[in-house]
Amino acid sequence: MTDMRNEEWLINKYNELRKTDARGYCFVSLKIKRFRIFNRLYGREMGDLLINKVYEVLDEWLDHDECIAHIHLNYYNLIMHYQDDYDEFFRRMIAMNRVIRDMPFEAFHGQIFSGMGIFPLPAEPVDFRTAQYNADICRAECPQSVFRNSHFEIYGVT
């Protein structure tokens, strides 16, 4: 696996952000959908390559003050800008999904889908685990997750 930033790195980055003004950012929980099936069909080597490629394409796509960390297997956390203009934010999330789905690697092009939970960071800062938990709950409890190739949902504090 390539040198991917991990959860410990993201915790430090998140805590730095909390010291300033975290408003205008969101915490994103992202999982590659049907990863276990992909891994069984194509083997662990291709599964590892997929994990790396998703990380690479998102890391290149994100703005310079946004970040991604590989947590484990097919699970990533991101810190991204969050606009008050929902239409603009939705377009950005759709574009992010497109970056994953249409990555310029023939073996995966058009076949990789994701589920995302988005937790807008509140004015009153929450700790890393609370932000992660809220984004995870949002992703896991999204009513569209079983009906869509890719999905995302936005929740506030639970």
Regions found by a protein language model. Name each.
Residues 40, 81, 144:
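Short, conserved catalytic or interaction motifs in soluble domains
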Residues 7, 11, 15, 86-97, ...:
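Catalytic-core segments of nucleotide cyclases and related cyclic-nucleotide turnover enzymes
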Residues 70-81, 106-139, 148-156:
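A short glycine-enriched loop-to-beta-strand structural element that forms part of the catalytic core
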Residues 27-29, 118:
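Conserved hydrophobic/aromatic beta-strand scaffold that supports enzyme active sites
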Residues 2-26, 33-59, 69-73, 87-90, ...:
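Conserved long alpha-helical elements within nucleotide-processing catalytic cores of c-di-GMP signaling
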